[in-house]
């Protein structure tokens, strides 16, 4: 194999790591998102991997990715969600909180 090809293959192998969080940062973000979900959302939504939502109209968080692209919720979370399910109060999160909540939602997809 030529040196240029080896260099290109090595660069491609490292590329995904440039755009992802280190595992400990991801875990911390997921934990923060879980805390936000339990504090702000668990009265109506099932926020864990199991169980029904206390409010029937509120979808379980583990199923949200089947309804919406979870990555697209960042703007709605930052601007304030006003229309979710019937009776849903308005929530507004700062960008870091929105990112943490999205990380938690994505962790439920696995």
Regions found by a protein language model. Give the residues of each.
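Bacterial N-terminal signal peptides
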Residues: 8-20
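Electrostatic cytochrome c docking/interface patches
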Residues: 20-36
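Gly/Gly-Pro-rich "capping" loops immediately C-terminal to redox-active cysteine motifs
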Residues: 32-34, 48-78
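The canonical Cys-X-X-Cys-His
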Residues: 33, 38-47, 101
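Axial heme c-ligation environment in periplasmic c-type cytochrome domains
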Residues: 55-63, 76-108
């Amino acid at each position: 194999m030529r040196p240029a090809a080896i260099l290109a293959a090595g660069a491609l192998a490292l590329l995904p790591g440039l755009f992802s969080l280190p595992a400990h940062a991801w875990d911390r973000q997921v934990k923060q998102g879980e805390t936000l979900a339990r504090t702000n959302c668990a009265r109506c939504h099932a926020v864990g991997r199991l169980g029904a939502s206390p409010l029937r109209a509120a979808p379980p968080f583990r199923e949200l990715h089947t309804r919406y692209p979870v990555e697209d919720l960042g703007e709605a979370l930052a601007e304030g969600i006003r229309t979710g399910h019937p009776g849903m109060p308005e929530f507004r999160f700062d960008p870091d909180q929105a990112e943490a909540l999205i990380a938690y939602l994505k962790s439920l997809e696995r």
